[in-house]
């Protein structure tokens, strides 16, 4: 991975992590990432961008056997959102805030998509003081994961995406699963 100076190559960092996890065999794979999710490509900063787009990363996540647990820590989003709600904020200031807020909101949606695509969960924290509890929740969730095997009657290995649906009858139980798999 090339070095990005002055910014965050979040997409490339996730891509490299998936490369490393691909080498791990016969084990449950999870990525726990503390991030604001803002990749340099979301900003007009003049810094070098990630080699991979979000769309490429999302497509790759759908093909990998790793669950992603983003821990979303973004003080700037919270501060800007609060300032937008302040009735004394001028219209001109509002426009500047909205421009600064846009990449944060996009990043937030993107990490939610990464978690959903991988059957993971997003944990939103306001500060570092919440991290111990969040890491404990992630560890507890990882201990409660059940794996199901599925063998399709369609044996064609054509590289196409195949949708699956998992449902349970137990009231109150939560199922998080991938939407499908790529036939290889």
Residue ranges and their predicted role:
Residues 1-184:
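Scaffold/interface architecture of coatomer-like assemblies
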